[in-house]
Amino acid sequence: MNPAPNLVMIGPMGAGKSSIGRRIAKHFNLHFADTDHAIVERAGTSISTIFKYSGEPEFRRLEREVLHDLLNHENRLIATGGGTILDPENRHRMQKRGFVVFLKINVNTQLERLAHDRYRPLLQQTDRKQVLSDLYATRQPLYQKIADMIVTTDHMSPNTATAQLILDLTAHWQKSSNTA
């Protein structure tokens, strides 16, 4: 099983962190937590409202608090928001308290998956492709830097990606326990 206290899913919006994460958590009998949902619960309002009235810095502060609290537990699968990686403290905590899986996706697949999504504050722009490309350029190196495992989810259904990730995680953890 996972040698780290938690399993942490990172990656851009639309990569499948929540949908795949729920399935993985169920398979490995982990408690599932989504940082965006936890932020909404803590703030008592939507992420869009937080961005609109309090700004992105306040959202990132709440995100840091929520992630810190979630990582203080064990046996959790934590699906993070796409921008969680931007904070150096978050990156450090995720590496220290989790096995980090980067769900990688290209911008064109993101556009397809997010075509009907009108709720993400960072996508409330006319040129979504440019926004996603800019976010990709900024965040991709950070995702790769802290990832213990990278899985590309382009052209995979959530079920296929889940099955592949279960195989990859099981093989990795068995290998880790055999060398320990």
From Swiss-Prot:
Binding site for ATP: G14, A15, G16, K17, S18, S19, R120
PANTHER family: SHIKIMATE KINASE, SHIKIMATE KINASE 1, CHLOROPLASTIC
Binding site for substrate: D36, R60, G82, R139
Gene3D superfamilies: P-loop containing nucleotide triphosphate hydrolases
Main subcellular location: cytoplasm
Species classification: Bacteria, Pseudomonadati, Pseudomonadota, Gammaproteobacteria, Lysobacterales
Protein localization: Cytoplasm
CDD domains (alphabetical): SK
PROSITE patterns linked to this entry: SHIKIMATE_KINASE (PS01128)
Pathway, per record: Metabolic intermediate biosynthesis; chorismate biosynthesis; chorismate from D-erythrose 4-phosphate and phosphoenolpyruvate: step 5/7
UniProt cofactor note: Binds 1 Mg(2+) ion per subunit.
EC class (word): transferase
Encoding gene (name): aroK
CC cofactor: Mg(2+)
Entry protein name: Shikimate kinase
